[in-house]
Amino acid sequence: MSRTASITRTTSETSIELMLDLDGTGNTDIATGIGFFDHMLTALGRHAMLDLIVRAEGDLHIDAHHTVEDVGIVLGQAIREALGDKRGITRFGFAATPMDEALCEAAIDLSGRGFLVFDVPFERPMLGDMDTQLVQEFFQALTANGGFALHLTRRAGHNAHHVAEAAFKAAARALRMAVEPDPRAAGAIPSTKGVL
């Protein structure tokens, strides 16, 4: 069964087209108009082993907020759609990912309930053309629309670029683990409730 999704979302603020393959090889083609965000989405796709195509046009003359948040919304929707009823998945994932002096941890539960615990402070306000506050906004939109819990924590680091990249890579590696098929639970819903 193909675990893919293709979603288009257009509002008065943004226009987004996204294609996702959960069983990809990490091939990405990202264009949001926000250089640093493109870099982070590329890292997310590569380390989650997702094939990911994103085309986004937004009201960048205001700022990057709507574009970053709306890409999170659409990517979350795509992950949820591609997972289907979640039969046979591992469900939980965890990763601790360093980048030089920075270290971030991520834990994911594909529970069907969107929840974010975000403890990733930044020591400067901007990453290129992206406000550091938008990192949390992205993950908030992603988890709410993806229907999964994510705990994301900075354990060490002071370079804002390194911290952000470690956070995205940790989330990616945890997601990769969680969506992987569990050979011991083929066809089973990984929940005592029988539904996720």
From Swiss-Prot:
InterPro entries named among the record's database cross-references = IGPD_sf (IPR038494), ImidazoleglycerolP_deHydtase (IPR000807), ImidazoleglycerP_deHydtase_CS (IPR020565), Ribosomal_Su5_D2-typ_SF (IPR020568)
For this protein, the record's Pfam families field holds: IGPD
Q: Does the keyword Cytoplasm apply?
A: yes
Give the UniProt keywords, A-Z.
Amino-acid biosynthesis, Cytoplasm, Histidine biosynthesis, Lyase
Taxonomic superkingdom: Bacteria
* GO MF, any single term: imidazoleglycerol-phosphate dehydratase activity
Name the Gene Ontology biological process terms.
L-histidine biosynthetic process
Q: Which reaction does it catalyse?
A: D-erythro-1-(imidazol-4-yl)glycerol 3-phosphate = 3-(imidazol-4-yl)-2-oxopropyl phosphate + H2O
Where is it mainly found?
Answer: cytoplasm
Q: Where in the cell is it found?
A: Cytoplasm
Query: What top-tier enzyme class does this entry carry?
Result: lyase
Q: What is its EC number?
A: 4.2.1.19
Q: Per its UniProt record, what Gene3D superfamilies does this chain match? A: Imidazole glycerol phosphate dehydratase, domain 1
Give the pathway annotation: Amino-acid biosynthesis; L-histidine biosynthesis; L-histidine from 5-phospho-alpha-D-ribose 1-diphosphate: step 6/9
Q: Give GO cellular component annotations, separated by semicolons.
A: cytoplasm
Record's family? Belongs to the imidazoleglycerol-phosphate dehydratase family.
Write the protein's name.
Imidazoleglycerol-phosphate dehydratase
Species name: Acidiphilium cryptum (strain JF-5)
Gene name tied to this protein: hisB
